[in-house]
Amino acid sequence: MQLLLIHSDYIEYEVKKSTPVAEEIEESFKQGRLEDALTAFMAVESFDEANPQEIIDRAVSEIENVAGQVKAENIMLYPYAHLSSDLSSPKVAVSVLKGIENALEGKYNVMRAPFGWYKAFRISCKGHPLSELSRTIRLEGAVPCGKVVSLDAEKKEVVSEALKAEDSAKSYWRILTPDGELHDAETFDLTGHDNLQKFVDYEISKNRNIEKAPPHVELMRRLEIADYEPGSDSGNMRYYPKGRLMKSLIENFVLEESSKIGAMEVETPLMYDMNHPTLKKYLDRFPARQYSIESDKRHMFLRFAACFGQFLMNHDMTISYKNLPLKMIEMTRYSFRKEQRGELVGLRRLRAFTMPDMHTLCPDMEAAISQFGEQYSMCIDILRKIGIDVSDFEVAIRFTREFYDDNREFITELAKKVDKPVLVEMWDTRFFYFVLKFEFNFVDAIAKASALSTVQIDVENAERYDINYVDANGKINRPTILHCSPSGAIERCIYALLEKAAMDAEEGKVPNLPVWLSPTQVRVIPIAERHMDFAQEVADSLLCRADIDDREETVGKKIRDAGREWIPYVAVIGDSEVESGKVTVTIRAESEPKKPMKVEMTAEELSERVFNEIGDMPYRSLPLAKLLSMRPKFI
């Protein structure tokens, strides 16, 4: 069953026309209105036919839970087939709807809109953090972990026990301030922390569905970075030469930074046996949905992280205390997660993504906490160098109450490090394999949050995978494991940079990408054919990615096109430049809308400036032909 729960000032409907499966109704049933109501839009699905009564009971529980949270006494039950593409039979749907109605009557003022009729309806959503919630209800046996599923069957996805636990986990939401005080997240005054307020609302509401496309979707296409691939599954993208360049630069940078702290790069398989006893247990402890396939009569799943391969490798290794902390990293191209279709959008949430996945084996919890702090700082530094500052993301720290009681000072230091309030999620019981976790979350232009960097302290998998090390006394011990993605998914880094630029544009600033990531760093524009030789000479002398706009277009159009491509430096060459040997350069980062910053400099000075801006960041050559006239159009 799919549920969409809207806390509304009012909801009213009026039937218009029956469909072939319409239930028979009395005249009084043809219209209805409730004030201050919780409206439950519902779609009964084919899975639900296996046990309609369990679906009724669980739906009633969900509705009552939300009604209690929002203090609603009026409930409208509204059949809404558009929530699912895999509906149950009309007979089962009506019986489930009536069953829910009967179970709620007596406790609430309940009204049910008729099934199988075209209806006009009007609703006014209250707009508070809990006013829009969605729920998916699945029968326990509908999608057993270990069953082969088809890639195109949304209903047959594999759902881990951890994901189910995540849906039902009781969370205590707090704001941790740098002075170490914990405050209730829903009552704490977040004035001056607008993005944190949006993040808090997003986390508490758990509404992950996308109502409109965020700005980066149009930008990724216009800048010819990436696009949807209609020939693949949803959430699988194509990357054009510019996008591939940007991805590879970030990938290389993250791997290089990880190498500096001693991480060894490895490579592991994309698919694993779902019935492998160790892996099957881990599947149920990781909150993700998996793609599954069949190979030689074996049930396989596509990895959603590098944990499986690295832990199996750790199991087979001989490890001494002298080797600890032991770090291994893999740039997973790709990791696969069967994210729900309504959550997929652009580069923000994908089903196939590139993720740097590092694991650290530590001798004990004390060492793990120390490493956690170091990697927290490393992640801040990595995002900053990519172009995402502390002011651009919000911090979430998640832990069990027991861990917090034992490590208050350490957790407070995490808030002090970023010098701003952070969101805390606390659990009474440990639902997952970790006791402590942080994420840096980017809040985009439509107030949706996405996790970037993350580190977790894992207290289960050393035992599960039988990973050991020999201590100084020759005794066999279990390590404590850290999971770390230093930057988060590479695609999300690009998403965050594009969204950040779009929000800058909304504030009246000129949008930019970091120079080291810009596919073209300098564009040379000759005014006429006679200036082409000097333009070529300038472009060839630059120690950066430089191209030449040699198209038969007006200079004005060439300059506008360079602006639409966000080229950091645009050098226009005419008669005076040829005579003086200097070029007139527009510097995008120092420009304002309709007020370009133009500076005259030599080609050598321009080259030195760009070279210094790139600094020690990775570099790759131009991904396309140097002459624009030689380039194809991808979009």
Curated annotation (Swiss-Prot):
It catalyses: tRNA(Thr) + L-threonine + ATP = L-threonyl-tRNA(Thr) + AMP + diphosphate + H(+). Residues 215-514 are annotated as: Catalytic. One of its GO terms (cellular component) is cytoplasm. NCBIfam families: PRK03991.1 (NF003068), thrS (TIGR00418). Catalyzes the attachment of threonine to tRNA(Thr) in a two-step reaction: L-threonine is first activated by ATP to form Thr-AMP and then transferred to the acceptor end of tRNA(Thr). Also edits incorrectly charged L-seryl-tRNA(Thr). Binds 1 zinc ion per subunit. Belongs to the class-II aminoacyl-tRNA synthetase family. The gene is thrS. PROSITE patterns: AA_TRNA_LIGASE_II. It comes from the Archaea. Zn(2+) binds at residues 307, 359, 483. It comes from Methanococcoides burtonii (strain DSM 6242 / NBRC 107633 / OCM 468 / ACE-M). PANTHER family: THREONINE--TRNA LIGASE, CHLOROPLASTIC_MITOCHONDRIAL 2, THREONINE-TRNA LIGASE. One of its GO terms (molecular function) is threonine-tRNA ligase activity. Pfam families: HGTP_anticodon, tRNA-synt_2b, tRNA-Thr_ED. Residues 1-144 are annotated as: Editing domain. This is Threonine--tRNA ligase. Its EC number is 6.1.1.3. It is found in: Cytoplasm. Keywords: Aminoacyl-tRNA synthetase, ATP-binding, Cytoplasm, Ligase, Metal-binding, Nucleotide-binding, Protein biosynthesis, RNA-binding, tRNA-binding, Zinc. Homodimer. Its cofactor is Zn(2+). The N-terminal domain is an archaea-specific tRNA-editing domain that hydrolyzes incorrectly charged L-seryl-tRNA(Thr). Catalysis of tRNA editing is performed by the charged tRNA itself. Gene3D superfamilies: Anticodon-binding domain (3.40.50.800), Bira Bifunctional Protein, Domain 2 (3.30.930.10), D-tyrosyl-tRNA(Tyr) deacylase (3.50.80.10). One of its GO terms (biological process) is threonyl-tRNA aminoacylation.
